[in-house]
Amino acid sequence: MSKDAGGGQMNSNLKTSLSECMEALDLFLSNNFQEALDQLRAKSKDSMYHALTYATMLEMQAMMTFDPQDILNAGNTMKEAQAVCQRYRRKSTVVDSFNSLVHKQSLDQFTEEEIHAEVCYAECLLQRAALTFLQDENMVSFIKGGIKVRNSYQTYKELHSLQQCANYAKGESHCHFEGGVKLGVGAFNLTISMLPTRILRLLEFVGFSGNKDYGLSQLQEGTTVHSFRALLCTLLLLCYHTFLRFVLGTGSGNIEEAEKLLEPYLKRYPKGAIFLFFAGRIEEIKGNIDEAISRFEECCESQQNWKQFHHMCYWQLMWCFTYKQHWKMAYFYADLLSKENSWSKATYMYMKAAYLSMFAEDDCKPFGDDEVQIFRLVPSLKLKIAGKSLPTEKFAIRKSRRYLAQKLVPLPVPPLEMMYIWNGYAVIGKHQDLTEAMLQTLVRAEKSLEGVTASEFLIDDRCVVKLLKGLCYKYLGRIPEAVESFSYIQLNEKRIKYDHYLVPNAMLELALLYLQLEKKEEALRLLENAKNNYKNYSMESRTHFRIQDALQQAKSLPQNGC
């Protein structure tokens, strides 16, 4: 349909579609999940916005469950949405591509619907790539999306350029288009800026570039535009500040910014499960553990239709009770997850056994469970998503294997070690009482290692405890003891037999401590050493993300003594 012949009708259809999708989004945020999906599904084969919104909601579900079937379903639905968007794109030859049109032909050859089709198509590609990364934390898998990622990136770049053109005429639904461009440009800039240097160089070689501050500003602007994408911009920023900065960073998210973003949504949707969850997470990383527990419990009570929200809360509640060293409650939530959620049975069972190992001798163990038997079960629960094992699961399986030996040597503090993998010490570090209590537990563990018979695991176990003690010392301001703890691991590097991840992570933690003390040169030496001289160790990708974050922090500091 040409612009002159039916532009008015197309604009009317576009406006109606956007209005209906906004209504469905409102239902979704009010916990009416199935009603929202049903409304969208009815038109998902014909309307690009219905198709995209429907697929986005299914992808959100997959991100909550990690269920292989949910992931497959979300991926297929997003692929179908992409095909719907393709039907609305401007028909052109390979040579006469969209990119060529922007630069070489008059912009008025695009109808408003065709412009929206471009941004929706790019968003489908971006979300499919995100789903790939969800399955494997290694950015190589993201890059393997290859043409999907590159086409999406290039399209967003061209659309962004289009907006800046003097002869670009804004359509009636321009705010939704603008929000889509800000979402894509912001997401790409932010994601690329976080990548470890080795991957960043590869991406830059093939034409990608990312600026963290620009990405954040684009997403921030996207939250203020009254558009279909404002929510997605908000959720992405909330995820960045409250999760990515911790799991794939050094734990320095902008919590004040997260609170500002969340406030209007909590006001409008006081029982909205998504927003109650983020409210709980914000309290958690502020160190207000009891308040966080209340919020997560409130989130579970707010709706019963999507158990996936409950599972996200159970995971956070498990950690909240870990921080408080309430082992029975932490076990309770790990047990619930092992029975109800499919993300990683191996990880959940590992955590169950880990908590049981912390029970006092006279504690009654639930259902007569025995941690040794559960640890032995963990390797058999290995799950592959899209042919890949989850990094956390690999870690749990490696740790559990020592329990398969006839003469077993127990792990010293398994839940506290896994807590480090998820950057939990950055959380309790804001709460002196919790940090002191954790340190005392580690001191007792260290003393117990002094009296054991020497084994092949002894040095590794001592170094694990030293790393965790060093973190507690750091957050308590006991700097010399923190330095001694991290340095102990480096001194014993050649004696470590299995836990090779300890050395680069000890260097990373010592470097972060030096950055705190404004010893930039010493910090940079450690970070470069950790980045360049160690490989093939547990949770390597996550460590490299954190090293990259630390290197970016170092750039903002003056030289030593300046």
From Swiss-Prot:
- In the record for this protein, the TPR repeats are positioned at 273-306, 463-496, 504-537
- Keyword check for Repeat: yes
Superkingdom, natural source: Eukaryota
Can you list the disulfide-bonded cysteine pairs?
none
Instruction: Extract the InterPro entries matched here.
Output: Iml2/TPR_39, TPR-like_helical_dom_sf, TPR_rpt
Q: Which UniProt keywords apply?
A: Repeat, TPR repeat
Give the record's family classification.
Belongs to the TTC39 family.
Cite the PANTHER family for this sequence: TETRATRICOPEPTIDE REPEAT PROTEIN 39 FAMILY MEMBER, TETRATRICOPEPTIDE REPEAT PROTEIN 39A
Task: Please state what the protein is called.
Answer: Tetratricopeptide repeat protein 39A
Which species does the entry assign this protein to? Xenopus tropicalis
Whichever gene encodes this chain, its name is ttc39a
